[in-house]
């Protein structure tokens, strides 16, 4: 079977890790990268060395020329276009484009990639109008005529599988989510201007920063049965990677915490294997760096007040786990054509 050919627009945190994921698989192939702000030699350096995930040792990366990188012996075209319409994806053979700039997140803007020859676009961020899919939750609803889709957010990818299990087994009446989230590139290294979010302008490495998130509400888009039943907020904390969701819910069907744990464990070993994890080990955030799964339920960290009110805790590598799901979604879509 021919490999699925993928291009990446935006070689930031997610773009580079999606590239690493693709290069580790044998069912897809990286054929092009576009980033107008990074020179080809700097791309080589940024891909090879990573402060969180370590040096990339699976593929030797070399600079062939100003417009080509070599991953092992595989050439990857490099473009530097600011306007997505101008990126020659078709010329490079890219059927799928991962839109990971964080800029072109609505359908109209992302559609510009189609003019350059791409057939499908997967946005690696939430979108206000593109249909959102979470692998393990609603990817089966994808229809082949959808050319632009969103992989939702890393937090929605963590929360949705857990919420699905709880709602399917016990019914969710209502719930609140808090994500304790690692700092990201949009935050400030020292206090600086942030007119839309004053707290967000404070130094990331020195503060716990309350923040907004649409991740819980977005679950209602991928699981319509939960629409209006969940909302949430975030705390940005001074760690570089791995975040954790606290989901506190009131459930319809009374169940002990042991019964809830058993249900999650069963699903993690069944239909959601590889997506939802389960652990009873005494783990901390760094233990999940590089974890492929979207959501790893921490059985020892949760508590219940009574048989209808429970707090559930689930970890996620907000970089690596999410990037893995981006590629999984691409492969699912490729099989629906």
Curated annotation (Swiss-Prot):
Keywords: Cytoplasm, Glycolysis, NAD, Oxidoreductase. Residues 152-337 are annotated as: Catalytic. NAD(+) binds at residues 13-14, 35, 82, 318. GO terms for cellular component: cytosol. The record marks 181 as: Activates thiol group during catalysis. Residues 1-151 are annotated as: Binding to NAD. Pfam families: Gp_dh_C, Gp_dh_N. D-glyceraldehyde 3-phosphate binds at residues 153-155, 184, 213-214, 236. The active site is at residue 154. It catalyses: D-glyceraldehyde 3-phosphate + phosphate + NAD(+) = (2R)-3-phospho-glyceroyl phosphate + NADH + H(+). GO terms for molecular function: glyceraldehyde-3-phosphate dehydrogenase (NAD+) (phosphorylating) activity; NAD binding; NADP binding. InterPro entries: GlycerAld/Erythrose_P_DH, GlycerAld_3-P_DH_AS, GlycerAld_3-P_DH_cat, GlycerAld_3-P_DH_NAD(P)-bd, Glyceraldehyde-3-P_DH_1, NAD(P)-bd_dom_sf. Plants contain two types of GAPDH: cytosolic forms which participate in glycolysis and chloroplast forms which participate in photosynthesis. All the forms are encoded by distinct genes. Belongs to the glyceraldehyde-3-phosphate dehydrogenase family. Key enzyme in glycolysis that catalyzes the first step of the pathway by converting D-glyceraldehyde 3-phosphate (G3P) into 3-phospho-D-glyceroyl phosphate. Essential for the maintenance of cellular ATP levels and carbohydrate metabolism. This is Glyceraldehyde-3-phosphate dehydrogenase, cytosolic. It comes from Mesembryanthemum crystallinum (Common ice plant). The gene is GAPC.
């Amino acid at each position: 079977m021919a490999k699925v050919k993928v291009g990446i627009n935006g070689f930031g945190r997610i773009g580079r890790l999606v590239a690493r994921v693709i290069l580790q698989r044998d069912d897809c192939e990286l054929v092009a990268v576009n980033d107008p702000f990074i020179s080809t030699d700097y791309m080589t350096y940024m891909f090879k060395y990573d402060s969180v995930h370590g040096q990339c040792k699976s593929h030797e990366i070399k600079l062939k020329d100003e417009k080509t990188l070599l991953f092992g012996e595989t050439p990857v075209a490099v473009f530097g276009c600011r306007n997505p319409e101008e990126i020659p994806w078709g010329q490079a053979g890219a059927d799928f484009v991962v839109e990971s700039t964080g800029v072109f997140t609505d359908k109209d803007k992302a559609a510009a990639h189609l003019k350059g020859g791409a057939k499908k676009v997967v946005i690696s961020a939430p979108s206000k109008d593109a249909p959102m899919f979470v692998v393990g939750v609603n990817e089966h609803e994808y229809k082949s005529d959808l050319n632009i889709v969103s992989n939702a957010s890393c937090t929605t990818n963590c929360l949705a599988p857990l919420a699905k299990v709880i709602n399917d087994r016990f019914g969710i009446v209502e719930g609140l989510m808090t994500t304790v989230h690692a700092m990201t590139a949009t935050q400030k290294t020292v206090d600086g201007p942030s007119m839309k979010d004053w707290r967000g302008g404070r130094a990331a490495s020195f503060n716990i920063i309350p923040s907004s998130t649409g991740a819980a509400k977005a679950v209602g888009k991928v699981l319509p049965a939960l629409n209006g039943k969940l909302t949430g907020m975030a705390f940005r904390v001074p760690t570089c990677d791995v975040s954790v969701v606290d989901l506190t819910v009131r459930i319809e069907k009374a169940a002990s915490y042991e019964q809830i744990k058993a249900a999650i464990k069963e699903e993690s070993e069944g239909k959601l294997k590889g997506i939802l994890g389960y652990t009873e080990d005494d783990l901390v955030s760094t233990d999940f760096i590089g974890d492929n799964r979207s959501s790893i339920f921490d059985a020892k960290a949760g508590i219940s007040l009574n048989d209808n009110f429970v707090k559930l805790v689930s970890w996620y590598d907000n970089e690596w786990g999410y990037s893995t799901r981006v590629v999984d979604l691409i492969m699912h879509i490729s099989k629906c054509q």
